[in-house]
UniProtKB/Swiss-Prot annotation:
Entry's Gene Ontology BP terms: ameloblast differentiation; BMP signaling pathway; cell differentiation; female gonad development; gamete generation; hair follicle morphogenesis; hematopoietic progenitor cell differentiation; keratinocyte proliferation
Signal peptide: 1-29
Gene for this chain: FST
Protein name: Follistatin
Region (Disordered): 314-344
Tissues showing expression: Isoform 1 is the predominant isoform in serum but is undetectable in follicular fluid. In the embryo, strong expression is seen in the palatal epithelia, including the medial edge epithelial and midline epithelial seam of the palatal shelves. Less pronounced expression is also seen throughout the palatal shelf and tongue mesenchyme.
Length: 344
């Protein structure tokens, strides 16, 4: 009799627990995605078995959620073959409570969807003129540079005020930095490393394009910085009194080009393929010949084994309109970009 009286209560408790379990499972059944694509489908799976509230609690603008509780095979087919999961529900429908991070703001686009756009705070910028960026490009003002940094170049900074120049004339570098003209005849502001450790072995010796032996790459960079213009690397090892390129051993797939002007050779990269671009500007080379581009000039130099340098942009029969380029340093080396020599 006692067991009969308690049976209905136990059954009710069991049903209650079962209902609660089903409710909790239905609340958890769903998939969280990192973005909603232009095709309206969810892409980049973040986590499975999450409720919409849990998924959207991240605060990310692009986070989306799907309600379907499907197996791994279906998820795989959605991601690989179908361009994402269907029935995608974005977490954010408006800009309310959207945190886009520093330098960005949430705005509704033409499709009435919230989007984070670059909107740097330019209110404290005092210099309104053009600036030269670390990428060697001129920006119409610092605010334009900040927008470019926000979009695709997080390391972009202002080098100096004014347009990017070909010489250090009228370049005022901030702080303790110094103006240096690199091998491509562009002015950069760098910080000179005045202390270089003594080389551990003779393998660190480098021969500069000035015919001077430097103890290490650090010593070459230091000399370049203090000089204010690119010295450039001729070849690895101590400088030798070479009579021709036959006396110089180049490494790293480089080829020796002879500079008849100073009677020295330098190792240069000669594997560059010139792109078929109509936008390239012709150059007048040191042999007084006009080449379709600087790349074409380098190609001719590598073919002949004789060093060629740019005298000025444009045809040799024309006078360069850029007065700054007329003052370019003659001892340039097109084989080594600033990143390989001027790593401050």
């Amino acid at each position: 009799m006692v067991r009969a009286r308690h049976q209905p209560g136990g059954l009710c408790l069991l049903l209650l627990l079962l209902c609660q379990f089903m409710e909790d499972r239905s609340a958890q059944a769903g998939n969280c995605w990192l973005r909603q694509a232009k095709n309206g489908r969810c892409q980049v799976l973040y986590k499975t078995e999450l409720s919409k509230e849990e998924c959207c609690s991240t605060g990310r603008l692009s986070t989306s959620w799907t309600e379907e509780d499907v197996n791994d095979n279906t998820l795989f087919k959605w991601m690989i073959f179908n361009g994402g999961a269907p029935n995608c529900i974005p977490c954010k429908e408006t800009c309310e409570n959207v945190d886009c991070g520093p330098g960005k703001k949430c705005r509704m686009n033409k499709k009435n969807k919230p989007r984070c756009v670059c909107a740097p705070d330019c209110s404290n910028i005092t210099w309104k003129g053009p600036v030269c960026g670390l990428d060697g490009k001129t920006y119409r003002n610092e605010c334009a540079l900040l927008k470019a940094r926000c979009k695709e170049q997080p390391e972009l900074e202002v080098q100096y005020q004014g347009r990017c120049k070909k010489t250090c004339r009228d370049v005022f570098c901030p702080g303790s930095s110094t103006c240096v003209v690199d091998q491509t005849n562009n002015a950069y502001c760098v910080t000179c490393n005045r202390i270089c450790p003594e080389p551990a072995s003779s393998e660190q010796y480098l021969c500069g394009n000035d015919g001077v032996t430097y103890s290490s790459a650090c010593h070459l960079r230091k000399a370049t910085c203090l000089l204010g213009r690119s010295i450039g690397l001729a070849y690895e090892g101590k400088c030798i009194k070479a009579k021709s390129c036959e006396d110089i051993q180049c490494t790293g797939g480089k080829k020796c080009l002879w500079d008849f002007k100073v009677g020295r050779g330098r190792c240069s990269l000669c594997d560059e393929l010139c792109p078929d671009s109509k936008s390239d500007e012709p150059v007048c080379a040191s042999d007084n010949a006009t080449y379709a581009s600087e790349c074409a000039m380098k190609e001719a130099a590598c073919s002949s084994g004789v060093l060629l340098e740019v005298k000025h942009s444009g045809s040799c029969n024309s006078i360069s309109e850029d007065t700054e380029e007329e003052e370019e340093d003659e001892d340039q080396d097109y084989s080594f970009p600033i990143s390989s020599i001027l790593e401050w």
